[in-house]
């Protein structure tokens, strides 16, 4: 059993286990340029970037960054999102959510069981990936790990 401790100042969690960074089963698209890094807000309602935004080729296939169950599919302020409650939640009891945003199209629905690498939609001009653990935002790059092959599991390909 792994105990994950989070520094929840300003609604931002740090993935640590007894002070050591903890890698979670989340894979990020290592083949895409980052447009906007994670920038924690200075207060709960302040501006910042609660995830990472990647440059994409519009229409590219978007694969799930984690395995789990889809808990939300919809448009927020004109932007399509897919939220996955990861299988890690069952293992640790921590509520770990991965948000995929700025999607042009979505090919899953709420309640679907998703495997890492499964197609969840098509990319827009960019792709947003955010991570929340027990309601606290955390830097996806601090928590992401590679698959057992050492290769990224979430990649985009021209569709």
Regions found by a protein language model. Give the residues of each.
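Short, solvent-exposed loop/turn positions at domain surfaces
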Residues: 56-58, 102, 108
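C-terminal segment of classical bacterial N-terminal signal peptides
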Residues: 2-10
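Short, well-structured beta-strand-loop connectors
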Residues: 61-70, 107-123
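Zn2+-dependent peptidoglycan hydrolase active-site motif and core
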Residues: 65-105, 125-131
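Solvent-exposed coil/turn segments that connect beta secondary-structure elements
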Residues: 39, 59, 67, 75, ...
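Short glycine/threonine/proline-enriched tight-turn/helix- or strand-capping micro-motif at secondary-structure
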Residues: 32-65
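Acidic, glycine-rich catalytic/binding loops that coordinate metals and/or anionic ligands
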Residues: 15-29, 48, 55, 109-115, ...
């Amino acid at each position: 059993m792994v105990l994950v401790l989070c520094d929840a100042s300003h609604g931002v969690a740090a993935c640590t286990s007894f002070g050591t960074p903890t890698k979670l089963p989340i894979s990020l698209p290592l083949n895409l340029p980052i447009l906007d890094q994670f920038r924690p807000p200075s207060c709960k309602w302040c501006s910042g970037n609660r995830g990472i935004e990647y440059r994409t080729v519009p229409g590219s296939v978007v694969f799930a960054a984690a395995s789990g169950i889809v808990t939300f599919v919809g448009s927020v302020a004109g932007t399509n999102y897919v939220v996955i409650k990861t299988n890690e939640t069952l293992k640790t009891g921590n509520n770990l959510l991965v948000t995929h945003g700025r999607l042009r199209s979505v090919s899953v629905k709420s309640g679907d069981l998703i495997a890492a690498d499964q197609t969840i939609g098509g990319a827009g001009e960019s792709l947003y990936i955010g991570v929340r653990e027990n309601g606290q935002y955390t830097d996806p790059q601090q928590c992401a790990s590679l698959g057992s092959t050492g290769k990224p599991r979430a990649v985009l390909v021209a569709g």
